[in-house]
Amino acid sequence: MTDTSRNRKVRGSKIRSSRSDKRQSRGSEDKELKRLADARDTDSEQAGDRVGDAFIPDEQSFIETDAVARVTDRMRRWLSVDRPVHLIGPTGCGKTAVAMHVARTRDRPVVWVNGDADLTTSDLVGEYAETERISEHDQFIHNVVKRKDIVRDRWVDNPLTLAVQEGATLVYNEFSRTKPVANNVLLSVFEEGVLELPGKRGASRYVDVHPAFRTILTSNSVEYAGVHEPQDALLDRLVGLHMDFYDAETETAIVRAHVEAADVPVAAIVGMMRELRERLEITVGTRAAIMAAEGLTAADDPDADTVVDVCTDVLASKVSQRSDVEALRDVIEETLADRGVTLS
């Protein structure tokens, strides 16, 4: 008797999936899992590229006189022995510019962090900020659909973690404006060479610090409003370099590098701003001299009144009342008359 069971035709939909269908379904699921894993690996591999493009301000003109070189040489000395450098000084004295210059000359990626009172540890190291979903569909029985969704939290690295992993130079600007509790994560980085990621689960909670990783921090002096005094345990691990305003020759060179017009009396403007620095209770930094020189480039045939107007506008943001602006203008007029500044 001939067995024809394998040749029988069955009408209607199949009740069970064939082995090939099941293998194809599993293969699709495996491909999806592999795609997600590859995406995570690609993100990690491209971290170094993202570091160089996404987190640093544009490069500006940098003048290195003898006075500036003394600061940069000291910074490089400490960075060469893997000590974090903390630049402290009045606003507008050039801390950020020198920090970025030294960081760029290390020939390593540079990561930028700008501190403020709202900055948290998560803003520094990262957090679970994304989710990924994997869906599985199984029609084992023709009229029954089985669906399973797998939702996973996805960790997103923030600047400190990227810098630690890639051996970058971390420039932490306005470090002392961040509340001390947010900076506790730096303790283990500087002491044990390990970054702990609070909130992250599993073995990847701990990240070994790349041997090329370095840190430069900048802070205003403690008398400025909004400045938090960092905890002693962290300060004990930092090298502190106190900066002040540069000499007149250096300030003149810095201002001239920022102003393209050749007919602006840069030396006279710098001299006047240095005199105002002594006469006024507000801080008059090198940045103020740059702004004043830029303002004069936009003026047609500037005279003494124009100089007074420009200098008043530059410094008026540092006072709170109109009466203070009037007093400020009077001091500027007196200083201009005393110095006999000429615009030629």
Swiss-Prot record:
Main location: other
Keywords, alphabetical: ATP-binding, Cytoplasm, Gas vesicle, Hydrolase, Nucleotide-binding, Plasmid
Induction: In PHH4 (a deletion of the p-vac locus) not transcribed in exponential phase, highly transcribed from stationary to mid-stationary phase. Small amounts of longer transcripts that probably include gvpC-gvpN-gvpO and further downstream are also seen. Gas vesicles appear earlier when grown in static culture, possibly due to O(2)-limitation.
Nucleotide-binding recorded as keyword: yes
Catalytic activities: ATP + H2O = ADP + phosphate + H(+)
Compositional bias ranges of the Basic and acidic residues kind: 18-52
Region entry Disordered, spans: 1-55
Enzyme class: hydrolase
Residue sites binding ATP per the record: 89-96
EC number: 3.6.4.-
Localization in the cell: Gas vesicle; Cytoplasm
One GO MF term: ATP hydrolysis activity
One Gene Ontology cellular component: cytoplasm
Keyword Hydrolase: yes
GO biological-process terms attached to the record: gas vesicle organization
Family matches, as CDD domains: AAA
Bias (Basic residues) ranges: 7-17
Subunit structure: Forms homodimers, a GvpN-GvpO heterodimer, interacts with GvpC and GvpL, might interact with GvpA.
Family designation: Belongs to the CbbQ/NirQ/NorQ/GpvN family.
Note in the entry: Encoded in a 14-gene locus called c-vac which produces cylindrical gas vesicles only in the stationary growth phase.
Known function: An ATPase that functions in gas vesicle formation. A minor component of the gas vesicle, also found in soluble extracts. Gas vesicles are hollow, gas filled proteinaceous nanostructures found in several microbial planktonic microorganisms. They allow positioning of halobacteria at the optimal depth for growth in the poorly aerated, shallow brine pools of their habitat.
Protein name as catalogued: Gas vesicle ATPase GvpN2
Gene: gvpN2
